[in-house]
Amino acid sequence: MIPTSDITGLILAGGRGSRMGGVDKGLQVFNGAPMAMHALMRLSPQVGHVLINANRNLAAYESFGVPVVVDAVPDFAGPLAGILAGLEQCQTPYLLTAPCDSPFVPTDLAARLSTALAEAGARIAMPVTLEPDENGRPRRQVQPVFCLIDAALADDLTTYLQQGGRKIDAWTARHPSVEVVFDDAAAFANINTLAELRQLAERR
């Protein structure tokens, strides 16, 4: 397994929040705290350092007490732009990402992904969940925004984005990757609308 001190965590909070009406998703309150804070608190014990990627409300994110990195690619270019911002500031061999709108980040995410990456000799490790399809049969669902990445891939990601690439699954497919099955699909649930946020808060 890769030592905790060799991993930097990155909370991805740089999106437009368009499905939430343009609000900053990471700052929406869930169970008394911003969603990004929930993700941060669950990821922090698993890594040696933590960053937040954000493109607005920077002072609010800086108040969380960790460094904030801004996309170098303009116009809200998607999660890969945030990942590149993290890789450019990362001082460790590996970067572990999680989205700001997933308040139940698994507490064993780093351990399981790093073990699989080391054993497979891969450069990227991603979780996979099994979720029912329309017929109730289990369907594999890759969760690429939760990924452990070899920080040496920063230059390749820069090139991919400069060439107009934006799809995270297309970029990860360029590199040796390993997938790790997690049983708790709900731990990877992301909240896309204010209605979903209210519903989840009522259930918890």
Curated annotation (Swiss-Prot):
Its cofactor is Mg(2+). Keywords: Cytoplasm, GTP-binding, Magnesium, Metal-binding, Molybdenum cofactor biosynthesis, Nucleotide-binding, Transferase. GTP binds at L12, A13, G14, K25, N53, D71, D101. It catalyses: Mo-molybdopterin + GTP + H(+) = Mo-molybdopterin guanine dinucleotide + diphosphate. GO terms for biological process: bis(molybdopterin guanine dinucleotide)molybdenum biosynthetic process. Its main location: cytoplasm. Mg(2+) binds at D101. CDD domains: MobA (cd02503). GO terms for cellular component: cytoplasm. InterPro entries: MobA-like_NTP_Trfase, Molybde_CF_guanTrfase, Nucleotide-diphossugar_trans. Its EC number is 2.7.7.77. One of its GO terms (molecular function) is molybdenum cofactor guanylyltransferase activity. It is found in: Cytoplasm. Transfers a GMP moiety from GTP to Mo-molybdopterin (Mo-MPT) cofactor (Moco or molybdenum cofactor) to form Mo-molybdopterin guanine dinucleotide (Mo-MGD) cofactor. Belongs to the MobA family. Monomer. PANTHER family: MOLYBDENUM COFACTOR GUANYLYLTRANSFERASE. The N-terminal domain determines nucleotide recognition and specific binding, while the C-terminal domain determines the specific binding to the target protein. This is Molybdenum cofactor guanylyltransferase.
